[in-house]
Amino acid sequence: MAEDTEMPDAEAVRENTLMYGHDDELDEKFPTRPMNLHKSPPFHTLFTDLFDPLMETQKKGRQPPGPRRKAGPHGHSNLSPHEAKRNIIERFIASWRKTVGNDFYPAMRLIIPDKDRDRAMYGLKEKAIAKVLIKLTKISKDSDDAKQMLNWKLPGQLHKASASTAGDFAGRCYQVLSSRQLNTKLGDMSIAEVNNALDKLSQLGSEDEQVKIFQRFNRRMNAEEMTWLIRIILRQMKIGATEKTFLDIWHPDAETLFNISSNLRRVCWELYDPKVRLEGEDTGLSLMQCFQPQLAAFQDKGGSFEKIVARLQANSDDDSFWIEEKLDGERMQLHMIEDPEAPGGKLFGFWSRKAKDYAYLYGKHLQGDEAGALTRFITDAFGKNVRNIILDGEMITWDMDVDHIVGFGTLKTAAISEKENKTDKSTGQRPLFRVFDCVYLNDKLLTPYTLRDRRRALESAVKDVKRRLEIHPYIEAHSHTEIEPALRKVVAESSEGLVLKNPRSMYRLNDRNADWMKVKPEYMSEFGESLDCIVVGGYFGSGHRGGAHSSFLCALLLNKDAKPGDADYEKCWSFFKVGGGFSREDYAAIRGRTEGKWKDWDPRRPPPIIELGGHEQNRQHERPDQWIHPSDSVVLECKAASVEGSDKFRFNLTLRFPRFRMLRTDKRWDQALSREEFYEIKANVEYKREEKEKEFEIEKSRRKRTRTTKKPIVVAGSETITTPYAGPQSKIFDGLSFYIMTEQLHPTKKSKVDLEALVKANGGRVVQRDSMEPNLVIVADKRLIKVASLEKRDTNNIVKPVWIQDTIQQNEVDNGALPYLLPFEPNRHMFYLLGDNQLDYEANADDYGDSYARDIADVEEMRKILGATDPPQKRTKFDRESFLDQLEDHGDSLSHLKTYMFSSTKVAFRTSDDPVWTLRAQLAGNYIRFGGGQITEDEDEEGVTHTVVPDGQTASVSRVADLSRVVGVGWVQKCWDESTRLDEERYQWG
């Protein structure tokens, strides 16, 4: 006899109706969805049983090692923090299953509210909630408590406790509510009732209606419960556990399903039984269901192009890889279904990488009211046989007037403008969807197929609609030497970099692996000029920087010639916001010069002398917390990576990655940069960039690649060399001309004069300029400006000096044999190699770098070759740099931590006879290693970013590489003390 199925009690039925209504559509969509058997627990159990224990575990961390502690029911555990957190979550979920039922969705959407796509955004940020609470508690908006909430980033003025909550809005609200709470004990409002009220709150727009919902909460909650409710509304939980942990504990396949659907409700309702696993097509993505796309991995810090290509898993049968330009836009997926009832016959869906629905902007239909900024123009984009399709790509902004991509910051503005374009005008800026993958076609899931097959499907199903929807082009490459020319091209065009792809790879949802690799130029030429700009606004920090200005709004003067009384006197346009590179002394100096002169920014009455972004639309983008008259302010000297367009600032341009250099105490406010002066600087910098090639390094150590003369010189076996062997004074170079541009650096140093003498002694002719004569050998071992200029021309190979030595030595070894010129080896002999010669010269050595024509006499070189023959160990190891880059990619950068502050540096230390300086240098080296940097003793090593010199060694600084900054140990110490990377020029040689 089968067991009786337990039926939901009356309270459970009431709560189910309260949260989901009598929704037949839900039952049809989720026919097997679970229903709880009993009432959900009180809201406060979320923080008493889950949030607080998790945060307490976070604070404690792992217990220090010591005597073995007692284990068992009455002893202490020695679990790691991660294990302890999992235990807490497992207990909470097990308790829910036992006492409530299998529908965990009501709790899950409160635990990870930022992943809940079913509930609309509340439209409530900190200040809006503060205004609601002021009305709720019926306190004066001019009272101290009201000001504490409205100015939550400011240090507390009411009592000492307020100072500790500067930057913590929910904590500040607790202080205000705790003295006015209707309930001192924990309330009885259930999780289901809270969800019902939050659903209503998300549908309301007016402040008065929002106050009524908050009154309902306040009547049944105490101050602590209200504090957690506010965190849920703001979607700022910070409880010490990620959504991945919760999903993994809920069900083994929960993360997989979330990756293909981005639907928390579906995860909870379809995977309520841990014993029932996803199978087959259930693990694949679906039409009109947002999925988590595949991501590109970050290149290894210090990895060469050769190593990057090796990670793309090329093999002897297929050594190809694809090179694509990395686009500066927003990752977007397009879903299309044929629908006879939709205007135009097709239904569209657009989702960002963060699962935000953009169909309202880019369009749901081809025609009618819901034809958006893109769909109205792509009627002919799909083949006649395409019934449905899912495309993966990048939404970018394209400027039709210059026919070029525009920075990401302009995308939404361009889309809104294009939405109103009814005539298909070919001017201005517009959204352009660049498609690089097809993951679903005509009811067929394509993710298991190779990228090459998916590309064929894409090209057969989609046709370009010029500057609306285009298939993103790629270059098929076969050697790592093809990467640098492509990278140089995109750098010259101010692009973001490259993406390298393995055409043999399948599509992996929500995975960042080596099948797609980003390659970015880390050390590009900076904007080139320091900018002295006036400070007009200040922003209060949060967390440990709460209560004081942590960043500043800088502006450009409109008219430096204006006099007091003129309309333009002191008038400024906002330009950029800077918060990096300040030390405690810098903050103190700025505070000392401006204290008492700051005014709170009133959005209803903004100062007329300061215009912000959005001014013409009566908006206030990047609004500061406080402002200051330019005549009372200070001038900051700042540098940046580049200038880019942005409607967030009044000037419509801003600095990318600005950093503070120094406080210009020698400049008056009216000597700060004006709008016209900046235009002149910008034009000058752009002119210089056209004249001089951008210098860059690839992450930590870009591999120098070698090339030789376009016209082949005499090679092994040539009958033109008939002179018999004559020892060191041979005629091996007879008939060749040598243009030696630099000294030799590797494997030993030789001066330019010594090299020229060696060439002459062996029959060669020395010239002092390049030409197109067929037997000219150009020699260099350093990338000087004249060498870089020759590379840019791309007409001649450039040979390393070691080839001269190798050729002479080989002919000494072959005493008595017919003398011959040693064939070029790409890695050892070539400094710059023309693409046309690549395959020919690669044939001169095997895969491990062992030459077919040259004897290996050097032990270290032999050891290196033998080491390369060892098969790589198949192992999975933690990639720290990739992990940190992913955190930054998700907006959770660790750049404020000391263990990350030097992560992008490689530092060379000079030696000194001064024992005191040597000790300081050792300590500085330890700081750099702890901060994630690399240490080297060779200043000429690839990728060196900083050179630390002893005090007084300024005379020899000229030999430091162009891209290496010269500093003293004082810079390292100061960065360490301030927990931030400071500007190098302030701490040179000390």
Curated annotation (Swiss-Prot):
CDD domains: Adenylation_DNA_ligase_IV, BRCT_DNA_ligase_IV_rpt1, BRCT_polymerase_lambda, OBF_DNA_ligase_IV. The keyword Zinc does not apply. One of its GO terms (cellular component) is chromatin. Gene3D superfamilies: BRCT domain, DNA ligase, ATP-dependent, N-terminal domain, DNA ligase/mRNA capping enzyme, Nucleic acid-binding proteins. Mg(2+) 1 binds at residue 394. Keywords: ATP-binding, DNA damage, DNA recombination, DNA repair, Ligase, Magnesium, Metal-binding, Nucleotide-binding, Nucleus, Repeat. PROSITE patterns: BRCT, DNA_LIGASE_A1, DNA_LIGASE_A3. Its EC number is 6.5.1.1. ATP binds at residues 324, 326-327, 331, 394, 436, 496, 501, 518, 520. Residues 57-84 are annotated as: Disordered. It catalyses: ATP + (deoxyribonucleotide)n-3'-hydroxyl + 5'-phospho-(deoxyribonucleotide)m = (deoxyribonucleotide)n+m + AMP + diphosphate. Its cofactor is Mg(2+). Residues 728-821, 900-989 form the BRCT domain. Disulfide bonds: none annotated. One of its GO terms (biological process) is nucleotide-excision repair, DNA gap filling. GO terms for molecular function: ATP binding; DNA binding; DNA ligase (ATP) activity; metal ion binding. InterPro entries: Adenylation_DNA_ligase_IV (IPR044125), BRCT_dom (IPR001357), BRCT_dom_sf (IPR036420), DNA_ligase_ATP-dep (IPR000977), DNA_ligase_ATP-dep_C (IPR012309), DNA_ligase_ATP-dep_cent (IPR012310), DNA_ligase_ATP-dep_CS (IPR016059), DNA_ligase_ATP-dep_N (IPR012308). It is found in: Nucleus. It is an enzyme of class 6 (ligase). Mg(2+) 2 binds at residue 496. DNA ligase involved in DNA non-homologous end joining (NHEJ); required for double-strand break (DSB) repair. Belongs to the ATP-dependent DNA ligase family. This is DNA ligase 4.
